[in-house]
């Protein structure tokens, strides 16, 4: 459960993480230095992840949008190994942002853990995937299913 101020996961660092709560949809936004992640208030679901890949204004694309199976440990402060590879791809493609969506929003380091969940998709996930799909059609985004 999210309570109070979240602290950075970086060792020895006690930097507060900015958080906003969307009471309409019961979502929590974690953000830091241009990076952002949206979670369920219970922290069991991560709905999307955005990391700034490039500074300046010379981009081939505004964003690379990745649609993957399920989120693991990545957040606005740190990337897990899979998202690190996506981030590196985004930089090579000269896109400004990496966005990560997941078919299942339930956070698990082992996808088999989702089988025991009543709702591995998450209550807000389908709506957000539709929103990002529409955005990809309207912009010069690269849409990657991995």
What are these model-derived regions, one by one?
Residues 96-113:
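Short connector loops at secondary-structure junctions
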Residues 73, 85, 92, 111, ...:
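Catalytic phosphate/metal-binding cores of nucleic-acid and nucleotide-processing enzymes, i.e., regions
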């Amino acid at each position: 459960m999210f309570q109070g101020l979240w602290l950075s996961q970086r060792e020895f660092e006690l930097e507060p993480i900015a958080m906003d709560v969307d009471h309409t949809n019961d979502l929590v936004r974690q953000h830091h230095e241009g990076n952002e992640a949206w979670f369920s208030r219970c922290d069991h679901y991560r709905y999307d992840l955005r990391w700034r890949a490039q500074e300046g204004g010379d981009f081939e694309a505004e964003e690379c949008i990745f649609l993957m199976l399920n989120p693991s440990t990545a957040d606005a402060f740190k990337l897990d190994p899979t998202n690190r590879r996506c981030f590196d791809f985004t930089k090579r493609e000269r896109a400004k942002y990496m966005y990560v969506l997941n078919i299942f929003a339930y956070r698990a380091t082992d996808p088999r853990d989702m089988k025991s969940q009543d709702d591995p998709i998450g209550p807000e996930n389908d709506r957000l995937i539709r929103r990002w799909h529409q955005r990809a059609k309207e912009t010069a985004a690269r849409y990657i299913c991995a």
